[in-house]
């Protein structure tokens, strides 16, 4: 079973995360940021990952540290769960709607940590959550999972819908990339 648990503690956050890449979408997520909790639950459900998250953070300062660090820890856990990466598809992509929002995402589990996004200059809050923090989450994930991740907002006006489409698209994209399709490392170099 491809699963991993990661614990990370800093002066700003304390996060324990478990993921099973071959799960069925079960989740137990507890963070001090309600919208982040909702997005992580959506990620687990639509990617069919089993996910447990216990997070504490200095939300009296900002949601930034907690959101970014959850992305970092998720990236570390996925990297650990993938092990030697033998047999994985490596690439994944999806285009997902959420009402008026439409989001494209693509990933290459390449060993080259990069993150690119286009957000149509959308700014604002979803309740108390700064929309722009989703990009910090995805950047943390991409860097720590050593993946190249692209997320492009193709359309959308309601920030909640755009953010949710991003997380659902990301989940489906990642699920596609971690699928086991063969036996060797999917690279002409022989390593990722």
Swiss-Prot record:
Organism the protein comes from: Aquifex aeolicus (strain VF5)
GO terms under cellular component: cytoplasm
Any Pfam family the entry gives: IGPD
Molecular function via GO: imidazoleglycerol-phosphate dehydratase activity
Pathway assignment: Amino-acid biosynthesis; L-histidine biosynthesis; L-histidine from 5-phospho-alpha-D-ribose 1-diphosphate: step 6/9
Family named by the database record: Belongs to the imidazoleglycerol-phosphate dehydratase family.
Keywords: Amino-acid biosynthesis, Cytoplasm, Histidine biosynthesis, Lyase
Primary localization: cytoplasm
PROSITE patterns: IGP_DEHYDRATASE_2
Name this polypeptide is given: Imidazoleglycerol-phosphate dehydratase
GO biological-process terms attached to the record: L-histidine biosynthetic process
Entry superkingdom: Bacteria
SUPFAM superfamilies in the record: Ribosomal protein S5 domain 2-like
Gene encoding the protein: hisB
């Amino acid at each position: 079973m491809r699963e991993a648990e990661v614990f990370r503690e800093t002066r700003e956050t304390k996060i324990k995360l478990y993921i099973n890449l071959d799960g069925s979408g079960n989740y137990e997520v507890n963070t001090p940021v309600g919208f982040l909790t909702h997005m992580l639950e959506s990620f687990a459900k639509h990617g069919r990952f089993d996910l447990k998250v216990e997070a504490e953070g200095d939300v009296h300062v900002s949601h930034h540290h907690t959101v970014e660090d959850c992305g970092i820890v998720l990236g570390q856990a996925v990297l650990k769960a993938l092990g030697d990466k033998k047999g994985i598809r490596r690439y994944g992509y999806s285009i997902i709607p959420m009402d008026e929002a439409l989001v494209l995402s693509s990933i290459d589990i390449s060993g080259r940590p990069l993150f690119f996004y286009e957000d149509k200059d959308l700014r604002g809050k979803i309740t108390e959550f700064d929309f722009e923090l989703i990009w910090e989450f995805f950047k943390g994930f991409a860097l720590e999972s050593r993946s190249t991740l692209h997320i492009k907002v193709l359309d959308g006006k309601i920030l909640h819908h755009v953010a949710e489409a991003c997380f659902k698209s990301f989940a489906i994209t990642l699920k596609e990339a971690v699928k086991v399709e063969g036996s060797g490392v999917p690279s002409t170099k022989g390593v990722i």
